[in-house]
Amino acid sequence: MDFLKKSLFLVLFLGFFSLSICEEEKRETEEKENEQEDDREERREEKRLLGMIPVAISAISALSKLG
């Protein structure tokens, strides 16, 4: 009976240990994916702002011609 209890305890412990390792790896993967998504969003914002520069320059030149 003690042998069965020890075996069951060992199996449960190892299962819990492997589950915690899997959860940690999953968390790390999600963090990396979130960082990559943040980088993509920053690049999109930079492209959008860079695309607005010619419009701003043309608006300023048009205003300077009027005044």
From Swiss-Prot:
Annotated localization = Secreted
Q: Which residues carry this modification: Leucine amide?
A: L66
- Residue ranges, compositional bias (Acidic residues): 31-40
One GO biological-process annotation of the entry reads: defense response to bacterium
The record's GO CC annotations read: extracellular region
| Ribosomal protein recorded as keyword | no
The main place the protein resides is secreted
Q: Which InterPro entries match?
A: Frog_antimicrobial_propeptide
Leader sequence range is: 1-22
Q: In which tissues is it expressed?
A: Expressed by the skin glands.
The free-text function statement in the UniProt record for this protein reads: Antimicrobial peptide with activity against Gram-positive bacteria (S.aureus, MIC=32 mg/L) and fungi (C.albicans, MIC=128 mg/L). Shows weak hemolytic activity.
Q: Which family does it belong to?
A: Belongs to the frog skin active peptide (FSAP) family. Medusin subfamily.
| Official protein name in the record | Medusin-H1
State the species of origin: Pithecopus hypochondrialis (Orange-legged leaf frog)
Lineage from the top down?
Answer: Eukaryota, Metazoa, Chordata, Craniata, Vertebrata
